[in-house]
Structure formats: structure tokens, C-alpha cells
Amino acid sequence: MPGSPSARSVTPASPAASSALPVSPVGRPSSLTEPEATVSGSSSPADSSTSPSSSPLQAAPSTSVVPVSRPHTRSRSGIFKPKERKDGTVAWLAACLAAAVADPSSEPRSYQAALRIPHWREAMEQEFHALLRNKTWTLVPPPPRVNVIDSKWVFKVKKHSDGSIERYKARLVARGFRQRHGLDYEDTFSPVVKPTTIRLLLSIVVSRGWSLRQLDVQNTFLHGFLEEEVYMKQPPGFSNPDRPDYICRLSKALYGLKQAPRAWHARLASALRAHGFVPSTADTSLFLLQKPEVTMYLLVYVDDIILVSSSQYAADALVCSLGADFAVKDLGKLHYFLGVEVTSRATGLVLTQKKYSLELLQRAGMLKCKPTTTPMSSTDKITAVDGELLSPADATEYRSIVGGLQYLTITRPDISYAVNRVCQYLQAPRDTHWAAIKRILRYVQFTLTFGMHIRPTSSRVLSAFSDADWAGSPDDRRSTGGYAVFFGPNLIAWSARKQATVSRSSTEAEYKAVANATA
């Protein structure tokens, strides 16, 4: 009935009237899709019945028009159902399998594809059985009113420093972003060793001729004990056939959990204290053991450990003792640590990041760029307002490349100042800042083999040098200070950054630089 409040649709009186309606981008009249649209005409059904010449759209009361929204489909959410073939296989699974056969270094994007590839299926089974042996969880019926997270498989091809394949790694990762603070986790901070500590210890090792070994702990986070109750669904592809409805109550940490790094560090620190080690007050990831007959240091960066010992026998005994508690793998002499290549020479150790530099250049699309001999030009005056703003996608890429350059400064003090300059514009990068990054990358291309040379020395003297300009920043007139700290002839720490406050004189800026160098 025209005047019925239950009417839910309106039909135009004629094609002409239909074509006169404004059409929304989704192909529907905008007056029907936009809730804020108003309908002209009388609000009384009696009035509308007395106007036979008016169109049905005008005659319908405003309350009868129901806004129509686009349906929330799977394609709009980026969810696509795999196309099944007549033989029962799935198109994208077959494509992944063909890619894995053609390229052994390819990484599958789903656990369904990995299960069809022999070496990845073996890696998944090894990870799953390691979790069972470690008693990571216990299958329990789902308790009421608990937060149950899920998990996913992550695949990674581990490579040597020369690019050759070391092993295929499958890792079960919990979706920790579904955890709730105060319910599933509390504190999350976990320390890692500082680069300055690494360089200082390497300088001591070279000078004293001590043993230098590298250890790796397999399934690192699985050794940490959880203090909170965390529940997780059974791993995809490895559900218990007898108890498919049960869930996992985690008793030990798992990769992806918010508190996993902290739980692992607490477990490792407890084990090292049992062996007589104490953490350093300057760096809590440095553990020391000093006895009359032996001196040992352990540098811990999550699961990567550097073992320094004055006695080879004591180092072997410690590795065996730690192997009783953790799955410790002795990698032998230090050669590759956290993306840093360590080369032993008669004149000491050489630290380089050639492999990482090439990966960074490839990520930036500048692997075949024209090299340059300096990271910055003395005539370049970079400011925060010159140039056009980058698009959101380019700004994200800018921040990613800057972060990669920051990590490259671990062994490259020559680019420290230039990288600090481009770091000052992460909030709103412009095309002039991007040009500065490209020049730094061109310099990296020219100096791929540059690094640090740590020489043996009998000196135990710490020397520090500092310098500062005055009001050098054109944006806020703050000064830039820098320092370099040497242990004997070896450079172990440096910095070049803008000072936190404005200096009223060059003397004040210099004093601030000295304070930063000695802090």
C-alpha cells in the first residue's frame, strides 16, 4: 500500500524519472544509499494521496526509505577462496609447489603449501615434535570465559653469510596481538647486548688471544616459563585426532607471545647464575665469571651468544653444562653475528656488513646505482620544509630505509652523521630528504667492503674525543654534537646527533658534547 509504513522499496514512475535520479558510485541512487538524504513532499499519508501527479518517490514518507549499504563480502576483505581443480588440487597450492621445486630458497606463504613440499613438511614436523618434547603445552577442555588465541606457521630459509642455504626453518608463532594486558601478560621488556659492549669485548679478545666462540640456542623462547595462564588453539595441520575440540594450555613461552623474550632471558639468567655468572651493572646482557684460574664472558642477544674464555677447556665444559638445560648448538669460531661478518686476520678482526648492505640496496631498488665517494655534500642544506611531501607509501618506505641505515652504523661510523640527519625528518619526509637517502645509499654501494678493524693492543687506556657546532640546525637552531671513544687504538663507541636543547654559546655546546661522551 502506498501509505503503509511497512513499505521498504520505491519504484520510479517512469524511465525518465529513473534516469533523473542521482546515481551513487556503487550503481544505486544516492538518495537510497546515503542515510542523510532527505525526501521532499508532505509527511502526511493523507496529503500524499491528494497529489496523484507527484512521483512515487515524492509521495513516499521519509520513514519508508531504508538506506542500502554495500555488503561486506570476502573479496572486499581480501579473502579469496582457492580455486579447486578437477583432480582435487588447488591452484595456488600447485603454484607454490612448482615454485618451491624450481627455487629451493623460496618460502611458502601458507602451511597447506608447506605440507606438500618435502623439506618444509620435515621442518614443520621437527618443530612440532620439539614442542611436544619440550612440554610446551597441555591439552585441556576449553575453560569458560578465557581468552583463546590462535597461531600460524612462519617459514624462513636460513642462509650463511655467503648466501648458501643453511637450513629450512619452520616456526609455530602465536598470535600475540590477540593477548589482553593484565589477563594474558604483564611485563614484556627484555634486554639485549649493546653494540659498544660487543666491540669492547672483541678488542679484549684480540689483545689477549682468548677463545672466541659462537653459540646458538634452538627453540629459544620455548625454554621460558610462563607466569600467566595463556590458552591457544591447537597448531594448524597438527590437531590431535582424539581430542580435536581441546585447546592448548601453555606452560612455556612460545614465539609471538608478548612476554616470550622476557621469560627466556629470565630463564637463561637463572641458569647462568647457577654456573657462577653474574650480570654486568653496565649491560645486563653481559654475564661475567671471574675465578683465579679462568675468566669468561657471555654476550647474549636473544638466542645468539658469544662466549669469551681464557681457557678452552672451561669453555667446552660450560657448553656441555648449558646443553643439559637448553638445545645449545656450538657454531665454532665467531664468523657471523647479527648480520655482521667477522673475519680473522693476522692483524686482528675485521667487522663488515657487506651482505646486509647488498640486501638494503636491493630493498631500496638501488643495487645497480651509480656510486659516490661521500655520504653527504658540504653544500647540501637539508631543512624540514624544503621540497614536496612524500606520499604515505613513500613515507613508509623512507622510514624503512632509514631504519636499515641505522643498523648499518654498527660497523660504519663514517655514515653516522649523515644517517642522523635523515633521521630527523621521519615524521614528514619530503623529496629532498629522499634524495639525501639516495646519496647515502650510493656511498654504501661505493664502500661495500668498508668496516672496522680491531687490532691487538697492550694498552688499556680509554680515550674520548668530542666536538660540536653551534646553532647548526636551520630548523630550530640546536647544535649537533659528536664523540668517539677508543680502547687503545680501537674505536668502540661513537655518536653524532642533535643536542636536546638550544645552546646559548659555542662553549655551552662543547660542554654538552663532552658530557655526552663521558656519560
Give names to the regions the model predicted.
Residues 1-270, 274-281, 286, 387:
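Chromodomain-type histone methyl-lysine reader module
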Residues 76, 165-166, 184-185, 225-227, ...:
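Short coil/turn segments at secondary-structure boundaries
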Residues 233, 308-331:
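Active-site-proximal acidic secondary-structure segment that organizes catalysis
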